[in-house]
Amino acid sequence: MQKFTFFVSCAKGIELLLKDELERLGISSQEKLAGVEFEGSIKDAYKVCIYSYLASQVMLKVATDKVINQQDLYEFISSINWMDYFAVDKTFKIIISGKHYDFNNTMFVSQKTKDAIVDQFRNVTNQRPNIDTENPDNVIKLHLHKQFVNVFLCLNIDSLHKRSYRQFQGQAPLKESLAAAILIKAGWLEELKKHQPILIDPMCGSGTILIEAALMAKNIAPVLLNKEFKIFNSKFHNQELWDNLLEIAKNSQKVTNAIICGFDIDNNVLDKAQRNIYQAGVEDVVTVKRQDIRDLENEFESEGLIVTNPPYGERLYGDQLDELLDIFNGFGDRLSQDFYGWKVAVLTSFADSIKEMQLRTTERNKFYNGAIETILYQFEINEHAKFKHETQLEKNIRIAEASAQKSDEHIDFANKLKKNLKSLKPWLKQTGLECYRLYDADIPTFAVAVDVYSEHIFLQEYRADATIDQNIAKQRFYQAIYQIHKTLDIKYENIHTRVRQRQKGKEQYQKENDKNKFHIINEFDAKFYVNFDDYLDTGIFLDHRKIRQLVAKAAKNKTLLNLFSYTCTASVHAALKGAKTTSVDMSNTYLEWGKNNFTLNNIDAKKHSFIQADCISWLKTNKDKFDVIFLDPPTFSNSKRMDDILDIQRDHELLINLAMDSLKKDGILYFSNNYRRFKMSPQILEKFNCENIDKICLSRDFLSNKNIHNCWEIKYK
């Protein structure tokens, strides 16, 4: 029997389930995006059309090629011998999907394809096949991807998920194929192997889950319920084979003793469900009745499966939030109290409702109901199911996903993240940087800074203005967390948060937590330890990236004095270029951190100096001279270890004079601070050669915040 390549499309997220389904039909396939591909006969393709609960469309793969202009497209389509696929007296229709780099207009692609096909038939037969968009004999599908065009001949036009039984439905209907997918994922096929399988949908709506479960229990081929289904009349079509396979499917139905029950509190919805059940012919298996989910009782003799897609998120969310949460809280109580040993699966896009169930999930899987992203949460009701304690991470996730439901203003924040990332990508590729600022209060209502550290995000919330409602500010902050997770595909546990004033530099170093968890990041040829949880800052200032490079370059094979050295990142860069470094800081914690940074870079820390001291006091007694000095003081400090309070605007003249006393006559002092209203002392400008290098030190990712720091290069006259 002749073999072909077929592509079977499905809803995004169920590809593996479809692959397994084809395996059960004796067909080996490969997982692709939004479908699977297999080599097989027309009979194999017919079996998928008849028996698949999950497939949307079955297509014969005709050809694939790279196409860069309209002439390429015409020649590619013309190179296919269309008379091998259908006769000139058969009508056809062209559908286009995907996106192509060079073709923005899908109507143009369709027209060019039609021209190539019609011209080929006309040149050979002096006749042309006609287009029929309503009831064609054949459907040709072009899928565009980057610069490639994939050509398929469809075996069916209407999606296989349409079963025709669902003539009465609610406001947010669940696709039949998705209902089947969550049943399979939840374990219904395994449940059917039991002596008496049991399935409950306690929020059944119009009954889609119940009906799909019954079809599987009775081994009813889905295509038998699709009254609109039409197999296309291509030259490969074998009507006798198709009719024989349909007859086998009809004769394969069986009687089942499965118990399938649905409940809902809405009588109008239950009436729709009952009519759909009769339409599907499964009224002998499925029963429905009115019941509040909070009154759910276990009247069964053995354990079973509960699968549901709650409609309450759409019906009640908003003014009736409290009732919504109470419904799910009561549902969780009923499960933990009366359904020991049962398995439960809940499909929802409203994560906060799951939290209210107070049950520990065993598995979470993402599915799509059309364009709507949903999650299937699975539970096993046992002694470990009930939550004893909500972790801070779980709480943050719950609040973030609930906040995202309260308004859609965070969509602008998400779009800005995407726009900024797209803008930075060429620069990031060129520099190889993995740590950078992605967003800095670009939208006033989302006053946060988003710093990317490879797979982690450091999210700083600027303290809200007193005129801003604190609840609104909190909601926006959690919406930002949600969109960072969703838009940037960052795990929630990798989003680390801080609340602070806008850019005060190293104004305070107090310890925030005590997790003591360090991560390694790369910056050019150096590696550094960062800590996202225990301190106000991470251990590296991303906005100082360029001045670190300037300092390191100037100090190559020379001596460097790093004052207010923090975690010694500038010293590491310089040491990697052969500099002999001296790092001075008041904090022994940060100096030890700095030593660890040296060791991380395979630099012998013993060959460098680390001095714990008040920098002003140390400079007053220092006798050594250095080629390069990096002076990066905090804006303000009142540490007990200091002899006096440091105010950078007031004290910078003293600091610079003391630092210059330790600088060789041909040396360079790099002076940096983060005080936005900083003004250089006229006496310093008069005494030394001072050049402002703010623009030189401003990295691509900080262009929107040009006043983030003041940088100066100072030399002797």
Swiss-Prot record:
Offer an example of a GO molecular function term for this protein.
Answer: rRNA (guanine-N7-)-methyltransferase activity
The keyword S-adenosyl-L-methionine is assigned to this record: yes
Residue ranges of every copy of the THUMP domain listed in the record: 44-155
Where in or outside the cell it occurs: the entry states: Cytoplasm
Which Pfam families is this protein grouped with?
A: Methyltrans_SAM, RlmL_1st, THUMP, UPF0020
What InterPro entries does the record tag this protein with? 23SrRNA_methyltr_KL (IPR017244), DNA_methylase_N6_adenine_CS (IPR002052), RlmKL-like_Mtase (IPR000241), RlmKL-like_Mtase_CS (IPR053943), RlmL_1st (IPR054170), SAM-dep_methyl-trfase (IPR019614), SAM-dependent_MTases_sf (IPR029063), THUMP_dom (IPR004114)
The alphabetized UniProt keywords are:
Cytoplasm, Methyltransferase, RNA-binding, rRNA processing, S-adenosyl-L-methionine, Transferase
EC number(s) given by UniProt: 2.1.1.173, 2.1.1.264
Catalyzed reactions per annotation: guanosine(2445) in 23S rRNA + S-adenosyl-L-methionine = N(2)-methylguanosine(2445) in 23S rRNA + S-adenosyl-L-homocysteine + H(+); guanosine(2069) in 23S rRNA + S-adenosyl-L-methionine = N(2)-methylguanosine(2069) in 23S rRNA + S-adenosyl-L-homocysteine + H(+)
Q: Might you report a single GO cellular component term?
A: cytoplasm
Enzyme class, UniProt record, top EC level: transferase
Its annotated function is as follows: Specifically methylates the guanine in position 2445 (m2G2445) and the guanine in position 2069 (m7G2069) of 23S rRNA.
Q: Which family, according to UniProt?
A: Belongs to the methyltransferase superfamily. RlmKL family.
Designated name of the protein = Ribosomal RNA large subunit methyltransferase K/L
Query: To which species is this protein native?
Result: Francisella tularensis subsp. tularensis (strain WY96-3418)
